Amino acid sequence: MERGRNQLLIAILLASACLIYCRQQYVTVFYGVPAWKNASIPLFCATKNRDTWGTIQCLPDNDDYQEIPLNVTEAFDAWDNTITEQAIEDVWNLFETSIKPCVKLTPLCVAMKCNISTSDTTMIRTTTPSTAKEAPISDNSPCIRTNNCSGLEEEKIVKCHFNMTGLERDKKKQYNETWYSSDVVCDNSTDQTTNETTCYMNHCNTSVITESCDKHYWDAMRFRYCAPPGFAILRCNDTKYSGFAPNCSKVVASTCTRMMETQTSTWFGFNGTRAENRTYIYWHGKDNRTIISLNKHYNLSMYCRRPGNKTVVPITLMSGQRFHSRPIINKRPRQAWCWFKGNWTEAMQEVKQTLAEHPRYKGTKNITDITFKAPERGSDPEVTYMWSNCRGEFFYCNMTWFLNWVENKPNTTKRNYAPCHIRQIINTWHKVGKNVYLPPREGELTCNSTVTSIIANIDERDNQTTNITFSADVAELYRLELGDYKLVEITPIGFAPTSQKRYSPAHGRPKRGAFVLGFLGFLTTAGVAMGTASLTLSAQSRTLLAGIVQQQQQLLDVVKRQQELLRLTVWGTKILQARVTAIEKYLKDQAQLNSWGCAFRQVCHTTVPWANESLTPDWNNMTWQEWEQKVRYLEANISQSLEEAQLQQEKNMYELQKLNNWDVFTNWFDLTSWISYIQYGVYIVVGIIVLRIVIYVVQMLSRLRKGYRPVFSSSPGYIQQIHIHKDPEQPASEETEEDVGGNGGDRSWPWQIEYIHFLIRQLIRLLTGLYNICRNLLSRIFQTLQPILQNLRDWLRPKVAFLQYGCEWIQEAFQAAARAARETLAGACRDVWGMLQRIGRGILAVPRRIRQGAELALL
């Protein structure tokens, strides 16, 4: 019983010691953890287009991009998104570069006399709505071949003339000009004699406008965005994602986005890459803005044409200035128009049904009360009309007939095509301003586009009706194209508390690990537990570094090939900036690890205690990304503590290195050591001199306290006289006057010699006193601590005895177990050996038994 209690006490003591030792947690640095954070840096583009803009602005695309699935849940937002914002800005720059208005001039703000006739002002003749259902036109309709479909008439134009000076000195010149009526604003009064009206250009309120300096085509271009090394692009692959919420549970990682088209249009999105066999809606998180992706099953498309032929002649205004306008020669241009192919009716019904089932939608569920609606009149033409670009020309289409046809409104004109006109002065879609472009080029203009999305605002009205109002926000197109992406910065450095403390391990040969090709390979462990991911940090960190180096090399190669073309462009600067950003990130990570003393280590234990003991990771169930989100607010403090600890360790190592120099005898004779010795000697001499002065002053003060005494007097008790007798043979006549009053033949040594002996005695007395004081102080300290030390020895003696007894008991138990095992093994071996002997004798006896059996058979 007593022995069991002792064993229990030993176990409790060992457990207590382990708990005391293991309670302290230290910061451990892990390199290569699969974690990230949101980033906002310039991306670079890659394209296969070999036109001028694609060659100058982007790098060649090689289609070598893979997506790696991640078992994580991540938040995405199509509106608060770095990639979409950069795409909007870059496409705007592309738009300005391709259809470049590059000359700024003062608007033509002179009074013009214009002749507005009835025939000139006719754009769409007023027609009486027919109750009979009109068949939609198709590819085989005769009016398509003849450009003479019902309702399409000539453009609305105005003929004007005005006077200006400046071309010749002190002379006026009259100019004749033809304008689209939408570009001028006229007074209500008309001169009855000439039938002319005073008109002005409608942009005269703008102080400065920009005119196109050359005619360009706006051809479709496909390009993708790529992240620089050290960064990644995450994509939401969840069909429930609606642009804002809920969080995406199916995430994949890549280095580049999908290919996307350069789109610039209102109302509809054309040639998008997000079309699927379903209709889905991206809804803004705070207002009613939406972007609706149409089902590609319905094959929706739009075909636009500007028939006719004309000649454009510029006019010269003053010296050296030219203003391009539209004088028409021989024939006025026919009106442009667009017709819509595909099953639009069913596609729009599916849009309504999808809206009614959307979780953000709170309006009526009856799709008959959900209608498509054009924006209110009175706003910019780009809002009122559907604005698109066809081969560099800007089409403004009146969609009234089309909406009547889609909604099947009774007593209205319903057609699957829309009349359009081309404008020379347009409002910019990304920045506030106006651009003046060249007149349309000669010849017929045609373009064919696939309709993939609708830009709309959802207007709910008292839960009874809902209007899907078409919008002119061109930027929404790129929120649909790239809204399922987000840019993240890989943060391979992680912190976590462990019970391990830093030590200095022996440098051994590093073990080889399996090399995994690719930068994003280590992100495959993003969805596994922290403990499992930590076991593969060596391979992950090598994958990370190798991938960064590989990406850097690939980016450097393509930049070198394109450097002559990229030199003077804005996007070329962005690409170089992306590469510099990647290098800065890599060097920053390595410098940070080095400042913590963790360079070239995958798991680095430190001496910094973990500050928040209540915050500990769940190594079996928590991912590194979840853990990093919890401790991200501690990173600054942890980093500062690690730097301070590393500085202190370097200081300690320096001091230790200085002490190590004393164990080598030859270092004692080093020149720097001798200089130190001389310094120490000078300090000692100066100290002795100061001490002597202090002692002398103290002695003088002590003697002055006893009464006045001449400084150089010598009392019998102070200086012992040494008598010296004079030579008796010296004549008495040699005595001088100075000998009078003396003691006859006695003389004494000077007092300075005795004073030196006095100082020596005083110094010895002082040192003896200091020694006695120190000895008494140490004796008293030892006497004070002796009871405490005695109690500590008395307390430790049984504990040590218990530990010794426990160790002896464990040793005896091991010996008994070994002895029992040895005896058991010996017995088993004897039994096996006996069995083998019996089997052997039986085998050897087989011939004898056969012979005996044969003998018995013969008898």
From Swiss-Prot:
Signal sequence range: 1-24
Ranges where the record places region MPER: 658-679
GO CC list: host cell endosome membrane; host cell plasma membrane; membrane; viral envelope; virion membrane
Region spans: Fusion peptide: 513-533
Regions of this protein lying in the Cytoplasmic compartment: 702-859
Protein name, as recorded: Envelope glycoprotein gp160
Molecular function GO terms recorded: structural molecule activity
Short sequence motif YXXV motif: positions: 708-711
Organism: Human immunodeficiency virus type 2 subtype A (isolate CAM2)
InterPro entries in alphabetical order: Gp120_core_sf, GP41-like, HIV1_Gp120
Positions annotated as glycosylated: 38, 71, 115, 148, 163, 176, 188, 195, 205, 237, 247, 271, 277, 288, 299, 309, 343, 366, 398, 411, 448, 463, 467, 612, 621, 637
Ranges where the record places region Immunosuppression: 576-592
Parts of the chain that traverse the membrane: 681-701
Keywords, sorted A to Z: AIDS, Apoptosis, Clathrin-mediated endocytosis of virus by host, Cleavage on pair of basic residues, Coiled coil, Disulfide bond, Fusion of virus membrane with host endosomal membrane, Fusion of virus membrane with host membrane, Glycoprotein, Host cell membrane, Host endosome, Host membrane, Host-virus interaction, Inhibition of host innate immune response by virus, Inhibition of host tetherin by virus, Lipoprotein, Membrane, Palmitate, Signal, Transmembrane, Transmembrane helix, Viral attachment to host cell, Viral envelope protein, Viral immunoevasion, Viral penetration into host cytoplasm, Virion, Virus endocytosis by host, Virus entry into host cell
Domain of life: Viruses
Chain spans, region V1: 114-159
Function: The surface protein gp120 (SU) attaches the virus to the host lymphoid cell by binding to the primary receptor CD4. This interaction induces a structural rearrangement creating a high affinity binding site for a chemokine coreceptor like CXCR4 and/or CCR5. This peculiar 2 stage receptor-interaction strategy allows gp120 to maintain the highly conserved coreceptor-binding site in a cryptic conformation, protected from neutralizing antibodies. Since CD4 also displays a binding site for the disulfide-isomerase P4HB/PDI, a P4HB/PDI-CD4-CXCR4-gp120 complex may form. The surface protein gp120 is a ligand for CD209/DC-SIGN and CLEC4M/DC-SIGNR, which are respectively found on dendritic cells (DCs), and on endothelial cells of liver sinusoids and lymph node sinuses. These interactions allow capture of viral particles at mucosal surfaces by these cells and subsequent transmission to permissive cells. DCs are professional antigen presenting cells, critical for host immunity by inducing specific immune responses against a broad variety of pathogens.
Example of a GO biological process term: clathrin-dependent endocytosis of virus by host cell
Region V5: start-end pairs: 463-470
